[in-house]
Design a protein with these regions (language model features):
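Short, acidic/polar
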Residues: 11-26, 117-123, 244-254, 329-338
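Polysaccharide-binding and catalytic clefts of secreted carbohydrate-active enzymes
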Residues: 94, 98-300
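The substrate-binding groove and active-site-proximal loops of carbohydrate-active enzymes
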Residues: 2-14, 35-54, 99-118, 140-149, ...
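Conserved, mostly hydrophobic/aromatic
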Residues: 5, 24, 32, 61, ...
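A short, well-structured beta->alpha microelement
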Residues: 431-451
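Hydrophobic targeting/anchoring helices
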Residues: 205, 240-430, 510-529, 533-534, ...
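Aromatic-lined substrate-binding rim segments of carbohydrate-active enzymes
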Residues: 18-26, 31-98, 122-125, 226-234, ...
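A conserved amphipathic helix/loop scaffold
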Residues: 328, 460-633
Length: 633
């Protein structure tokens, strides 16, 4: 694993740069990301490039023995560009412009802005594409951050109409697919179709789903335009994009296919605070992050670009954007670094080198404080670098378990949750965590992935079944678990003929006759687990493998395939993992609370995420908080 940092030479006096570079090398860093927000300094006036400062910055880093990850600056179009084409900004769902004054103030569909992006990316690639310091390109920065995937601008509306025309061919085909006979929503031409916002009550869910598909395609094509330029002008240099955590607004598999390395921005403490975790979990893991947050995203993004992945921004201290922003427990920055290595990362880059004393992120910690003194994370980086040097490169081992993740499933359940607490990401994360708690390594894969090498397959939910998926499931010999709502919609957001699970009945013969959602706090009893949030009534000649206290079926099994007809709580997930692992011949480990295990091809890594010391039976020793054990396999 190569270690690096995010650096902004334009923020600091030029006479600091050489000393910064020297200190980076001394800390064990070898990569430096620069440039991703610097458009106004690269092109201060329209058509007038100021390359001098960037030339000198790159050369300074190069002389110090550092390699550069150069970002395209398209996440921050300068004021002069916004003033020249004010219609380039995104419009939010309420019809308000997403204006200048922060970042990501553009619409993916605006052709004029895309032209400007191609121009600036071409200029960068022509100047630096063959520079010996250049290790990697990063396209833009955090696509979709600040809720910017969806835009309801005129540019988006026009592009959406073209997208619909290409997809459906005729307005009547669109009307039929969407069911627009309902509420007299029929269109006579594609020109009549608007984005699905500013309606009196909810818009047609099929309209929403196509708008999300369209918006995702726009992100992918926007990225592809930059990738095509970089490949043409800088063909020997890898390309990445830095994705985010717990973010599903566009299909990351689609973008991942176009880059060489999928990277993501890891902020375990911020994510714990911002998402669904319970008060008890937020208290127990306040300074460590939930033990599966980082690992979940490592495994997700490893699957998004065919195996090559890394961390582009690693939290080094308190962040500035969560509801509360605690400091990491001493040792956690090193632990997060080594855990990324255990999951096969090619790089871990810390955000940022020096904490900014100004502007929006001045409360976000860095490896250095604003006065250039070392912050608490700096010695941990040196310690992690030493460990990485000792253990050497880590190849990723084939995981025994595949967990199927579909961005479209997140859109479907988000558009029509049918229950306030039905959250796709939480359902998937709970399944992942249940596997990890028993010491199992997991690959997170797209529905289109080849599943034949796995010994267990878990599909937390897959409302729309893609072509070929049933054949791949049926051809497996390993245990398969299908979660609630699987097969519940067609591609045009209809209830399938013959009811759910639609075409999945070819794999498991049952019919979902009714669904209901339960408010928080309502439970229905069962032996060893509880029915909460969501349940389905099932008609089948199969006898339930698992039932609730009233005898209502919860889990059905047909051969190697199971269907779970409720939101599975942790106790039920544990039961199912145990049964399926037994059938698959997989050894389980009952890991103590806060302990996680990950195996590379050559080493076994054990990490303690608990806030105190924990005795670890499989090691026969006690691990201190925020510590690890690494042993050859």
């Amino acid at each position: 694993v190569k270690l690096g940092c995010c650096y902004y030479p334009e923020h600091w006096p030029e006479d600091w740069w050489a000393e910064d570079a020297r200190r980076m090398r001394a800390m064990g860093l070898s990569l430096v990301r620069i440039g991703e927000f610097a458009w106004s300094r690269i092109e201060p006036e329209p058509g007038h490039y100021d390359w001098g400062w960037l030339d000198r910055a790159i050369e300074t880093l190069h002389v110090a023995g550092l390699k550069v990850i150069l970002g395209t600056p398209t996440a921050t179009p300068p004021k002069w560009l916004v003033d020249r084409m004010p219609e380039m900004v995104a419009i939010d769902e309420h019809g308000r412009p997403r204006g200048f004054g922060s970042r990501r103030h553009y619409c993916f569909s605006h052709e004029g802005y895309r032209t400007e992006c191609r121009r600036i990316v071409t200029a960068l690639a022509e100047r630096y594409g063959a520079h010996p310091a250049l290790a990697m390109w990063q396209t833009d920065n955090e696509y979709g951050c600040h809720d910017t995937v969806l835009s309801f601008s005129d540019a988006s509306a026009s592009a959406f109409r073209g997208w619909l025309s290409a997809r459906y061919g005729t307005p009547q085909a669109l009307n039929d697919a969407w069911g627009n006979v309902f509420w007299s929503m029929e269109y006579r031409s594609f020109a009549e179709v608007d984005p699905p916002h500013l309606t009196v009550t909810e818009a047609n869910p099929a309209h929403w789903l196509d708008y999300r598909r369209f918006a995702s395609d726009q992100v992918a094509s926007f990225n592809r335009e930059q990738v095509d330029i970089l490949r043409r002008l800088s063909p020997l240099v890898d390309i990445t994009h830095n994705f985010m955590g717990f973010f599903t607004e566009f299909d990351h598999h689609a973008v991942g296919r176009d880059v060489d390395v999928a990277t993501w921005d890891s902020y375990p403490l911020g994510f714990l605070e911002q998402f669904w975790f319970s008060r008890d979990e937020k208290a127990a893991y306040l300074r460590q992050g939930h033990p599966d947050i980082a690992a979940f995203h490592h495994d997700l993004y490893r699957g998004c670009s065919g195996g090559r992945w890394g961390v582009m921004e690693q939290q080094p201290g308190p962040v500035n954007w969560a509801r509360f922003n605690p400091a990491p427990l001493p040792g956690m920055v090193a632990l997060w670094t080594l855990e990324a290595c255990a999951h096969g990362a090619e790089l871990t880059s810390y955000f940022r080198w020096r904490q900014a004393p100004f502007a929006q992120e001045q409360m976000h910690a860095g490896l250095l404080r604003p006065d250039s003194s070392e912050a608490e994370a700096a010695p941990e980086v040196r310690a992690a670098a030493a460990v990485l040097s000792d253990i050497g490169p880590q190849a990723t081992a084939q995981a025994p378990v595949a967990l199927v993740f579909a961005y479209e499933a997140a859109w479907v359940t988000g558009i029509q949750p049918q229950g306030q607490s039905f959250r796709y990401l939480e359902l998937v994360f709970e399944a992942y965590s249940a596997l990890r708690q028993r010491g199992l390594d997991v690959d997170i894969v797209a529905p289109q992935a080849d599943l034949s090498a796995y010994r267990m397959v878990v599909v937390p939910t897959l409302p729309i079944i893609p072509e070929g998926f049933i054949e791949r499931l049926s051809g497996l010999a390993c245990p398969v678990l299908l979660g609630p709502r699987s097969g519940s919609k067609t591609a045009s957001f209809r209830i399938p003929e013959g009811l759910a699970p639609g075409t999945l009945r070819d794999a498991i013969p049952l019919t979902v006759t009714r669904v209901e959602s339960l408010r928080d706090g309502v439970t229905e009893p069962a032996e060893g687990f509880a029915v909460t949030r969501w349940r389905e009534d099932v008609a089948s000649d199969l006898s339930p493998e698992v039932a609730d206290a009233a005898g209502r079926g919860v889990v059905y099994r047909h051969g190697h395939i199971r269907y779970c007809a409720i939101w599975p709580d942790r106790a039920l997930l544990r039961l199912l993992v145990e049964r399926m692992a037994g059938e698959a011949g997989l050894d389980l480990i009952d890991l103590p609370e806060g302990i996680r295990l990950r195996r590379s091809a050559s080493h076994a890594f054990t990490f303690n995420y608990a806030s105190g010391p924990v005795f670890v039976p499989h090691l026969g020793e006690t691990l201190a908080p925020a510590s690890w054990h690494i042993a050859p396999r």
